[in-house]
Amino acid sequence: MKADTKNSILIIGGGLIGLSIAYEFARNDYTVEVLSKNRNESAGFVAAGMLATHAEGLEDELLVFGQQSQSLIPEWIKNIEYDSGIDCGLKKCGIVVPFKNLKRLKEFPTYKYGKYLNHKNLKKEINGINPSWEHGLLFEQDGQIDNRRRLMRALERACSLHRVKFQEGSDVKELIVEKNKILGAKVLNATGEMRNIFCEKVILCCGSWSKKVLNNLPIFPVKGQ
């Protein structure tokens, strides 16, 4: 490893995950550079921001992982809001899941974590719901965050204040590999210049487009996700 790459992080992808990782490394005194083609096209600007570990009906290890992750969010958001000065819109407002019969309700993987709603109380939570939905579960521990208008902008500002370097319009052509170790990336920048960026660690955060960098990854875009 080159001496000048110590504690340097190259993040490929400037969406919600890329910015979140950049923020954590930067606030712990790493040198961080974020590459993105067009950050405004990231999923974080269109995703609903649901924190729905229980309402999504997760099971087994994934449920435990989701619960642990969800428990960390308030403190994490508190740090981002403090550094950025932007309210991220975190709300523990609860999420309602309706059911047409009790059998379906009791088969729902996380039903034991929810508060039962009869039809009368379900209508109070979801005004105008079709009468065929007779039962519901209110997961009071779930909630939402304002990704599009607040969290993404807050992360951008917090990262900038921690001296994260952003390279917009960057197209990663390939990773630089030597002796089975990733040393950096070959990048075509917005001005058409090809450059090599060396670093201690490369973190791939391209979401659905990760296969463009590593074509053996079993990742593909899904409508609505």
Task: For the regions a language model picked out, list residue spans one by one.
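N-terminal Rossmann-like FAD-binding beta1-loop-alpha1 element of flavoenzymes
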Residues: N7-E33
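Conserved Rossmann-like nucleotide-cofactor binding loop
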Residues: I17, N40, W209
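Glycine-rich FAD pyrophosphate-binding loop
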Residues: A26-V46
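Short loop/edge segments at beta-strand edges and connector loops
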Residues: S36, N118-H119, M152, E168-S170, ...
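Dinucleotide-binding Rossmann-like beta1-alpha1 core, especially the glycine-rich loop
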Residues: G49-G128, E134
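Short beta-strand to alpha-helix junction loop
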Residues: V64-Q67, L102-K103, L138-R157
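A conserved short coil-to-beta-strand element within the FAD-binding core of flavoproteins
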Residues: F166-L183
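Central helical "cap/lid" subdomain
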Residues: N189-Q225
